[in-house]
Regions:
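A structural detector for beta-sheet-dominated domains
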Residues: 25-27, 58, 74
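Ampiphathic alpha-helical segments that act as solvent-exposed interaction surfaces
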Residues: 70-104
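Short proline/glycine- and acidic-rich turn/helix-capping motifs at secondary-structure junctions
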Residues: 54-58, 96-110
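Extended Gly/Ser/Thr-rich low-complexity repeat segments
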Residues: 34-41, 66-68, 84-91
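Intrinsically disordered, low-complexity regions enriched in Ser/Pro/Gly/Gln/His and often acidic
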Residues: 50-51, 90
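Short Lys/Arg-enriched alpha/beta "domain-start" segment
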Residues: 1-49
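Long, contiguous binding/interaction regions
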Residues: 2-9, 51-55, 61-62, 68, ...
Length: 110
């Protein structure tokens, strides 16, 4: 398991203080950089930037950003939904990492 614990922050996006939607960030305390090419290989429509150690992805109506030091999700309706979404994303990272021997990593920027 790559991510065992994380710190969570749920907030109103500063660029949209009038919105009723929230953003959330999980900071796992481990470097996710090596997992990004594997996520890039399996997530349809992901946009990977190896130099920035970032992978952007749209999941339903949520914008998701995987960085070396954090996972961020936007456009969630409330705190509970933000926590659930981040837990699902962390599980995705962990499952992908555990299966990395079966996945051909993609370093392609799209």
């Amino acid at each position: 398991m790559l991510i065992e614990t994380y710190d969570l922050e749920v907030f109103t996006p500063p660029c949209h203080p009038e919105t009723d939607r929230l953003s959330a960030i999980a900071r796992p305390g481990v470097d996710l950089r090596e997992a990004l090419p594997y996520l890039n290989a399996i997530l349809p429509g992901a946009v990977y930037n190896a130099a920035a150690a970032a992978l952007l992805w749209k999941k339903d109506s949520h914008n998701v950003a995987f960085h070396a030091d954090r996972i961020a999700v936007g456009n969630v309706p409330d705190r509970e939904a933000a926590i659930e979404e981040l837990e699902n994303l962390i599980e995705l990272v962990n499952r992908t990492w555990e299966r990395r021997a079966e996945i051909e990593p993609s370093h392609e920027s799209r």
